[in-house]
């Protein structure tokens, strides 16, 4: 059973995922980026994780290594990509399966 989810997206989709997960009794996490430190979607989740500084080569919501690393570090048992970004990336699914 899923107990927690890292929402690897932003904006309205993150709000909708968080709302639904909360109704299901799942603890929700979102990432805060330096570009959007006060974004509305941050208040929709149970917890906010500051995204580590990047070198700018990989946009935050496309950085599979860091997203999977955050999920492991915070002992989050699932990762939801929302739509766009990593939602159609098979590598994300494989990395989640392997971790």
Regions found by a protein language model. Give the residues of each.
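ATP-binding N-terminal substructure of ATP-dependent carboxylate-amine bond-forming enzymes
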Residues: 1-99
């Amino acid at each position: 059973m899923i107990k927690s989810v890292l929402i690897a997206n932003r904006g309205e989709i993150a709000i909708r995922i968080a709302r639904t997960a909360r109704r299901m009794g799942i603890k929700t996490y979102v990432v805060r980026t330096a570009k959007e430190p006060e974004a509305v979607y941050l208040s929709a989740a149970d917890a906010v994780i500051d995204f580590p500084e990047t070198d700018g080569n990989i946009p935050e919501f496309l950085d599979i290594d860091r997203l999977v690393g955050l999920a492991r570090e915070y002992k989050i048992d699932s990762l939801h990509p929302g739509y766009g970004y990593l939602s159609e990336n098979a590598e994300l699914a494989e990395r989640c399966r392997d971790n």
